[in-house]
């Protein structure tokens, strides 16, 4: 069954005729060509598919596209504004908080969601907030350092 689903994606209106039960991950990657959102485990365990929905980090491999109707979705492609990296993206680069890069989009968006809800997290709060995101390269310590640095640069999660 085809539904008309309208939402905002990376600050732009989107209107799709699509099966509303289709996973947001596949709509983003296949239908809209936004491949920064990664398919990792398909079960919500790794965090590679994380996007922001109304500012909250969610796993797009578990979210049906009909669940984002009339909401704001942000992918890694929409995080930088006017060619300027978001403070979290900048901090990841400055702290060398990536290696292969596969987990990075999900890590960055999870961190943005965390800092939006908790602008001044402790290291322990960052660890808890990021524990559902996996990095097989072992960059976790640098990722936490980057998030702490970004928190210092950001004002109220923005």
Question: What is the predicted role of each segment?
Answer:
Residues 1-158:
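Signature of N-terminal electron-transfer/Fe-S-associated modules in redox systems
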């Amino acid at each position: 069954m085809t539904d008309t689903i309208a939402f905002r994606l990376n600050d732009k209106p989107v209107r799709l005729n699509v099966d509303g039960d289709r996973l947001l991950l596949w709509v983003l990657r296949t239908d809209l060509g936004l491949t920064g959102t990664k398919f990792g485990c398909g079960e919500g365990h790794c965090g590679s598919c994380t996007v922001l929905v109304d500012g909250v980090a969610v796993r797009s491999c578990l979210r049906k596209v009909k669940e984002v109707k009339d909401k704001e979705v942000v992918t890694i492609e929409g995080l930088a504004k006017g060619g300027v990296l978001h403070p979290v993206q900048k901090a990841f680069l400055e702290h060398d908080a990536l290696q292969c890069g596969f987990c990075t989009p999900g890590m960055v968006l999870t961190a943005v969601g965390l800092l939006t809800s908790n602008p001044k997290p402790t290291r322990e709060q960052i660890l808890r907030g990021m524990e559902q995101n996996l990095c097989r390269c072992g960059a976790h310590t640098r990722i936490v350092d980057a998030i702490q640095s970004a928190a210092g640069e950001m004002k109220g999660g923005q």
